[in-house]
Swiss-Prot record:
It comes from Mus musculus (Mouse). Belongs to the class V-like SAM-binding methyltransferase superfamily. Histone-lysine methyltransferase family. Suvar3-9 subfamily. It is an enzyme of class 2 (transferase). The lineage of its organism: Eukaryota, Metazoa, Chordata, Craniata, Vertebrata. Although the SET domain contains the active site of enzymatic activity, both pre-SET and post-SET domains are required for methyltransferase activity. The SET domain also participates in stable binding to heterochromatin. In the pre-SET domain, Cys residues bind 3 zinc ions that are arranged in a triangular cluster; some of these Cys residues contribute to the binding of two zinc ions within the cluster. This is Histone-lysine N-methyltransferase SUV39H1. Its EC number is 2.1.1.355.
Length: 412
């Protein structure tokens, strides 16, 4: 029996912080939890729970890191050295007072509902900070990820796993390319047209790494078999996200969104859309479930035929949080690198214009490409595409909230 259980694990019913609380309360050291004899009696402010003012003296109810709520204490302002925690507490307090149509100046005593809100906000912020750390630990790309929610008390999404590349479903194989280019300079002196030429297509980028192909034309990058190195100008998408991005909570009912923290030049690569690769049959089954939930993250890979779909509902990268717009600043391209199966392209987003720091990133879930272009990139009826007359896939009409002057009122 013991041999069968070897290597097994179960989820703990208590959080890491709760276990630390129990250790300190029982005066037990536990190196695995970071509780030792040296820090058993350390006092660090985790967050502030309440506020009051008595005879012009300010007091704060302190939650001490590693200690249960029963050990919270009221402390005068001069005893607290946690400047950032204090500033954040008052920022949250003032914002909530304004939201409740009161003065922004704090009262002498907080009512219980307001104090409870500030506690929940502090707990949420810690949860989002842990999620941000987790995302950055898992990312393989240069661009950092930050997380913000100044709108409501929603925390990290449940059951979402950050991945950097496709997660291949059962029965699906990504075949590795057998040959690569032999170019000395893939941009200025390509041999046989480099990798794009070998597939009878055009070179995709200029010397700044900006795409110069029309939307709908495929991108063929150099692969792991090529003689060129990492700095080759035909290696752009494979280098991953280069910009610092922020996952933020929208204030207009669109849930989470993504904005850039840096200027992005027109035609520059921004991110890939990754998730689970599943068959279209499985996508149809999941799509019916997602429709009932009022959301879907299905993206059909129908560059040549509709056989496979990318599902980013539970496995994906930051593109999972990018919202729709009828006037988007991102454009979809099909990309081929180490796998040349045209039924399984990688999906890349490029900037349609200069995007300034602080702007939200969006793409059109119902994107249409000129049907005259035989190399069309059709994002389908599942994720947003749609446009094929007589498509057998029926989707629930979802109201559009993009708010642009070009808004079509419905996503599908």
């Amino acid at each position: 029996m013991a041999e069968n259980l070897k290597g097994c694990s179960v989820c703990c019913k208590s959080s890491w912080n709760q276990l630390q609380d129990l250790c300190r309360l029982a005066k037990l050291s536990c190196p695995a939890l970071g509780v030792s004899k040296k820090n058993l009696y350390d006092f660090e402010v985790e967050y502030l729970c309440d506020y009051k003012k008595i005879r012009e003296q300010e007091y704060y109810l302190v939650k001490w890191r590693g200690y249960p709520d029963s050990e919270n204490t009221w402390e005068p302002r001069q005893n607290l050295k946690c400047i950032r925690v204090l500033k954040q507490f008052h920022k949250d307090l003032e914002r909530e007072l304004v939201r409740r149509h009161r003065r922004s100046k704090p009262p002498r005593h907080l009512d219980p509902n307001l104090a409870n809100y500030l506690v929940q906000k502090a707990k949420q912020r810690r949860a989002l900070q842990r999620w941000e750390q987790e995302l950055n630990a898992k990312r393989s790309h240069l661009g950092r990820i930050t997380v913000e929610n100044e709108v409501d008390l929603d925390g990290p999404p449940r059951s979402f796993v950050y991945i950097n590349e496709y997660r291949v479903g059962e029965g699906i194989t990504l075949n590795q390319v057998a040959v690569g280019c032999e170019c000395q300079d893939c941009l200025l002196a390509p041999t046989g047209g480099c990798c794009p030429g070998a597939s009878l297509h055009k070179f995709a980028y200029n010397d700044q790494g900006q795409v110069r192909l029309k939307a709908g034309q495929p991108i063929y990058e150099c692969n792991s078999r090529c003689c060129c190195g990492y700095d080759c100008p035909n290696r752009v998408v494979q280098k991953g996200i280069r910009y610092d991005l922020c996952i933020f909570r929208t204030n207009d009912g669109r849930g989470w969104g993504v904005r850039t923290l840096e200027k992005i030049r027109k035609n520059s690569f921004v991110m890939e859309y990754v998730g689970e690769i599943i068959t279209s049959e499985e996508a149809e089954r999941r799509g019916q479930i997602y429709d009932r939930q009022g959301a879907t993250y299905l993206f059909d890979l129908d560059y040549v035929e509709d056989v496979y779909t990318v599902d980013a509902a539970y496995y994906g990268n930051i593109s999972h949080f990018v919202n729709h717009s009828c006037d988007p600043n991102l454009q979809v391209y099909n990309v081929f690198i180490d796998n040349l199966d045209e039924r399984l392209p990688r999906i890349a987003f490029f900037a349609t214009r200069t995007i300034w720091a602080g702007e939200e990133l969006t793409f059109d879930y119902n994107m249409q490409v000129d049907p005259v272009d035989m190399e069309s990139t059709r994002m389908d009826s599942n994720f947003g595409l749609a446009g094929l007359p007589g498509s057998p896939k029926k989707r629930v009409r979802i109201e559009c909230k993009c708010g642009t002057t070009a808004c079509r009122k419905y996503l599908f």
